[in-house]
Amino acid sequence: MQDQQIINPISQSQIPQELSENVILSSVSDLYDWARLSSLWPLMYGTACCFIEIAAMIGSRFDFDRFGLVPRSSPRQADLIITAGTVTMKMAPALVRLYEQMPDPKYVIAMGACTITGGMFSSDSTTAVRGVDKLIPVDVYLPGCPPRPEAVMDAIVKLRKKIANEDVRERGNLMQTHRYYSTTHQMKVVPPIHTGVYLEAAARKSPAAALGAGVGEDMTPALVAEAEKEEA
């Protein structure tokens, strides 16, 4: 009677070479992360001069389509927003609304010094937000004034690595417990500047008396003079 060969279960499994080259073992979470990092859809959103570098990336010289980036004009179709340029107090509510309309999971790249700290406007400006992370959570900070397209591509590569290492089941908890908010801005609703009644304003019909006295002649507005001619 032949002795049966005993295979040690602790030893390395005997997988044929053909099978090992055609089968990939992974998890659903890793597959989901790979799909997301390979098809980031950025929102076309720019507030200042940094957006010029984003426009340069769309051209054939840098060709950011090879990263799977598909520019979208609607926040409901995007999962990445690159805040390129200065964010003002008046633009802050619109930015927060755009971020809230993006489906989860969503990512933010703060591009440029003005976006990260306020930049040249951080010392004496009364309208610039000192850091977009006071409004929305930021995943990647990209300093520069403005950053070169190569730097933007490096930030996208780092974001792809971050997505590859995260677990989709933990991202919701991470975004809730590790927020970057440091200051609550009082974003008050203000009336619009252009009301459509500029020509009917009192300053247009009757200028200040001091202005006429300083010039030394009658300062009747042209519109009022034309109306008097038509009535005559």
Curated annotation (Swiss-Prot):
Cellular component terms (Gene Ontology): plasma membrane-derived thylakoid membrane; respiratory chain complex I
Cofactor section: [4Fe-4S] cluster
Topology versus the membrane, per the UniProt entry? Peripheral membrane protein
For [4Fe-4S] cluster, which residues are the binding ones? 49-50, 114, 145
Q: Which UniProt keywords apply?
A: 4Fe-4S, Iron, Iron-sulfur, Membrane, Metal-binding, NAD, NADP, Plastoquinone, Quinone, Thylakoid, Translocase, Transport
Reaction(s) this enzyme catalyzes, per UniProt: a plastoquinone + NADH + (n+1) H(+)(in) = a plastoquinol + NAD(+) + n H(+)(out); a plastoquinone + NADPH + (n+1) H(+)(in) = a plastoquinol + NADP(+) + n H(+)(out)
Q: How is the cofactor bound?
A: Binds 1 [4Fe-4S] cluster.
Classification via PROSITE patterns: COMPLEX1_20K
Quote the function comment for this protein.
NDH-1 shuttles electrons from an unknown electron donor, via FMN and iron-sulfur (Fe-S) centers, to quinones in the respiratory and/or the photosynthetic chain. The immediate electron acceptor for the enzyme in this species is believed to be plastoquinone. Couples the redox reaction to proton translocation, and thus conserves the redox energy in a proton gradient. Cyanobacterial NDH-1 also plays a role in inorganic carbon-concentration.
This one is known as NAD(P)H-quinone oxidoreductase subunit K 1
Species of origin: Acaryochloris marina (strain MBIC 11017)
